[in-house]
Design a protein with these regions (language model features):
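Beta-strand-loop-alpha "switch" segments that mediate conformational coupling across diverse proteins
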Residues: 137-179
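NTP-binding/hydrolysis catalytic cores, primarily Walker-type P-loop NTPases
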Residues: 175-195
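Hydrophobic anchor at the start of a short beta-strand
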Residues: 34-35, 78, 100, 128-131, ...
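Acidic-aromatic/histidine active-site loop/patch
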Residues: 1-5, 194-195
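P-loop/Walker-type NTP enzyme "switch/lid" segment
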Residues: 5-15, 22, 26-80, 84-91, ...
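Conserved C-terminal guanine-recognition region of P-loop GTPase G domains, centered on the G4
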Residues: 112-128
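Inter-motif core of Ras-like GTPase G domains
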Residues: 89-108
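Conserved beta-strand segments of the P-loop GTPase G domain that flank and frequently precede/overlap
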Residues: 38, 81, 101-105, 131-136
């Protein structure tokens, strides 16, 4: 069984790590993958939200403990939500991943911390081809344009910008399917991240 592990990390809080994990888990489940969502954040937002929506997606299983053999035999898509810090747990999650998604906002703190975030990822043993920046909720401000410019100049791997969506957040928080009531063009932007 082919497996793919995605870790979503940034040591800045509030950048959309959990939302991206929830989105990936639900889309993967809709595409027939057996999803293991791992919540390493002490706030447990990923686990709590998945408990609400697990009845809708039988291929998303909520467990509090797991042994390695069970995980290897029963899942083919791993999504790992992380806490905003730098520690050994984070290093292990980064090393485990086939892909590391790094949500980046169009703000000053994202810009000044970007190099430090990527250095930490690369120093944890993640290759440059594995780390993908996700432009999350970029607004049309001068600062956001500066962030975009830096991303382009540095030749980082960058996913298309995810739009701010109150509907996405509301659907996920209420345990509904992520795309409930969304127009097709809205859905397409989020599905592109998954593919």
């Amino acid at each position: 069984m082919n497996k793919l592990a995605v870790t979503v990390w940034n040591y800045k809080g509030g950048v959309g790590k959990t939302t991206i994990c929830l989105l990936l888990a639900q889309i993967a489940a809709q595409n027939g993958l057996k999803v293991l969502a791992v919540d390493l954040d002490e706030q447990k937002n990923l686990a709590e939200t998945l408990k609400l929506s697990s009845h809708m997606f039988p291929s998303i299983e909520v467990r509090t403990t797991l042994n390695d053999n069970y995980a290897d035999e029963n899942f083919n898509f791993y999504v790992i939500d992380t806490h905003p810090s730098k520690d050994e747990t984070i290093k292990r999650a980064l090393k485990f991943a086939d892909i590391v998604l790094v949500p980046v906002l169009g703000d000053y703190n994202s810009l000044i911390n970007l190099r430090s975030v990527l250095d930490y990822i690369y120093n944890s043993g993640v290759g440059t081809e594995q780390a993908v920046l996700v432009k999350n909720c970029m607004t049309k401000t001068k600062l956001a344009a500066e962030v975009e410019k830096v991303l382009d100049e540095q030749h980082y791997l960058v996913a298309d910008s995810l739009p701010r969506s109150n509907l996405l957040a509301k659907n996920i928080a209420s345990g509904n399917n992520w795309d409930k009531f969304m127009r097709a063009n809205q859905k397409a932007q989020f599905i592109k991240l998954y593919t």
